[in-house]
């Protein structure tokens, strides 16, 4: 059975605190109290340990966990800022349900976010869309869809900087191993200073132009590759010696730490070797293809994506699809492991719209990247009356007349709102750059950002409905 959290409503200042809330908070408060949403969060938290429900101290109520995570993304705060702000703010304490209780610390809240996982977050989002439909916030008569890039939290990738990262990480791990195991087996030789000098040399030479400087650049890269190769070889010997118990500890906890450090070496060594391989291919063989390149040792799923932006020709992250209905409600989001073409996403987006809102949209609007004759025919076959997707390359006079009609121009005006929605979720809810780790973390980050935006927009729409 879930435990109820005491709130300010049980005290003497509930009315005064409620008057200080933002307008959307009052209606969002009722939406987030939905039993299906709270139960989904409760079940996810209960799975952290097989006996979480029956053993240990009482945990924080699921309602509070959900509201704290949503507030974090509504305000685009870190967990540390969330802890500080809620502790000192009566309105946030009231909205999140913390009330007069002790505020959970940042590390605890971070563990909650990991415990929920992308599946539960997706479930919460879909339930919010159903609530928006039931309350008349959105009916699903129109749909617009667009894609954007959410960047991973990495520095701008270059071959030299990635090798520098690899040497730094491998050396740091080997230093920890030496501190635990002592001076047995292979001795650590720290080449960090040598690599740093190589990186500075490459930076100076790379700024100059001309064939002579290109030859100098190859020489500098050859030296950096040689030094990096020596560090990788040393790391492999360290890993092998831990496996053969040459490097070991008599204390159980320290031995477990050594085994964990060996796993870190075994994870990082192949990544550094891949960076070396792609560096040789680019510098010495002129292969500049980006497909399959490793762009970060810490976020290996990162892709380089070109969306044709003049100011940012290359973006490093994952492709995300956002589709909306009326009142700026995001009905679906999707993070793609590999970038698809936009035209491959339209039919699936319409099917998702039908599944969530129980009807085909009367109008579908998207930009020209989503257009194809096949997509237009498939959309009409699914019940869409008006497909408002421009064909920029058409030579057909009939098609050009169709695209000049008032309904088509009005649909394209409404479509531009999807670009505004993307701008809002990036600026207000932090979807410009993902602060969570890995592909799973990207899904959680995008999902919570979308939920935060929907909660605010549902609250504002219900606030407008309540005005007599």
Segments from the language model and where they lie:
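Trp/Phe/Arg-rich N-terminal binding region typifying the photolyase-homology
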Residues: 4, 50-64, 74-114, 143
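Active-site- or DNA-interface-adjacent structural scaffold in DNA-acting proteins
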Residues: 99-301
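Mobile genetic element proteins and their domesticated derivatives, centered on retroelements
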Residues: 68, 82, 146, 322, ...
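Charged, often Cys/His-bearing segments associated with DNA-binding zinc-finger transcription factors
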Residues: 1-43, 277, 282, 458-468
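Basic, short loop/linker segments at the boundary and entry of helix-turn-helix/winged-helix-like folds
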Residues: 25-70, 74
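Short, contiguous acidic/charged loop-to-helix segments that flank catalytic cores in large enzymes
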Residues: 307-311, 334-341, 406-413, 437-441
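Helix-centered, glycine/charged polyanion-binding patches within enzymatic domains
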Residues: 363, 368-440
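Electropositive, glycine- and tryptophan-enriched low-complexity nucleic-acid-binding patches
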Residues: 301, 309-356
């Amino acid at each position: 059975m879930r435990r109820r959290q005491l709130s300010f409503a049980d005290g003497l200042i509930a009315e005064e605190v409620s008057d200080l809330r933002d307008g959307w908070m009052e209606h969002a408060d009722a939406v987030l109290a939905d039993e299906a949403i709270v139960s989904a969060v409760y079940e996810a938290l209960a799975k952290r340990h097989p006996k979480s429900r029956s053993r240990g101290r009482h945990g924080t109520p699921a309602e509070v966990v959900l509201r704290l995570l949503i507030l974090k993304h509504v305000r685009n705060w870190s967990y540390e800022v969330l802890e500080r702000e809620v502790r000192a703010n009566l309105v946030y304490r009231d909205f999140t349900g913390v009330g007069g209780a002790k505020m959970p610390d940042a590390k605890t809240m971070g563990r909650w976010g990991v415990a929920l996982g992308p599946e539960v977050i997706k479930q919460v989002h879909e339930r919010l869309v159903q609530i928006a439909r039931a309350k008349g916030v959105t009916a699903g008569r129109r749909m617009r869809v667009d894609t954007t890039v959410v960047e991973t939290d990495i520095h701008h990738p270059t071959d030299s900087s990635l090798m520098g990262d690899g040497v730094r990480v491998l050396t740091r791990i080997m230093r920890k191993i030496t501190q635990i195991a002592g001076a047995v087996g292979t001795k650590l030789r720290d080449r960090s200073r040598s690599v740093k000098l190589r990186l500075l040399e490459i930076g100076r030479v790379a700024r100059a132009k001309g064939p002579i400087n290109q030859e100098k650049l190859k020489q500098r890269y050859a030296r950096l590759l040689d030094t990096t190769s020596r560090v990788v070889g040393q790391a492999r010997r360290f890993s092998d010696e831990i496996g053969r118990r040459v490097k070991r500890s008599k204390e159980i906890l320290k031995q477990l730490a050594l085994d964990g450090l060996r796993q870190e070496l075994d994870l990082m060594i192949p990544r550094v070797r891949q960076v070396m391989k792609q560096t040789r291919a680019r510098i010495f063989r002129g292969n500049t293809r980006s497909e399959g390149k490793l762009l970060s040792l810490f976020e290996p799923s990162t892709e380089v994506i070109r969306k044709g932006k003049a100011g940012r020709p290359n973006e490093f992250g994952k492709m995300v699809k956002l589709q909306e209905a009326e009142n700026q409600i995001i009905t679906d989001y999707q993070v793609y492991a590999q970038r698809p073409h936009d035209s491959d996403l339209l039919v699936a987006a319409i099917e998702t719209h039908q599944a969530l809102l129980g009807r085909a949209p009367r109008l579908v609007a998207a930009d020209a990247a989503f257009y194809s004759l096949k997509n237009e025919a498939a959309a009409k076959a699914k019940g869409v009356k008006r497909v408002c997707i421009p064909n920029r390359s058409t030579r057909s006079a009939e098609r050009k007349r169709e695209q000049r009609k008032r309904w088509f121009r009005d649909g394209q005006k409404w479509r531009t709102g999807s670009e505004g929605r993307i701008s809002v979720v990036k600026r207000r809810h932090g979807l410009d750059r993902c602060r969570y780790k890995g592909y799973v973390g990207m899904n959680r980050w995008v999902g919570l950002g979308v939920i935060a935006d929907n909660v605010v927009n549902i609250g504002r729409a219900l606030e407008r409905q309540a005005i007599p």
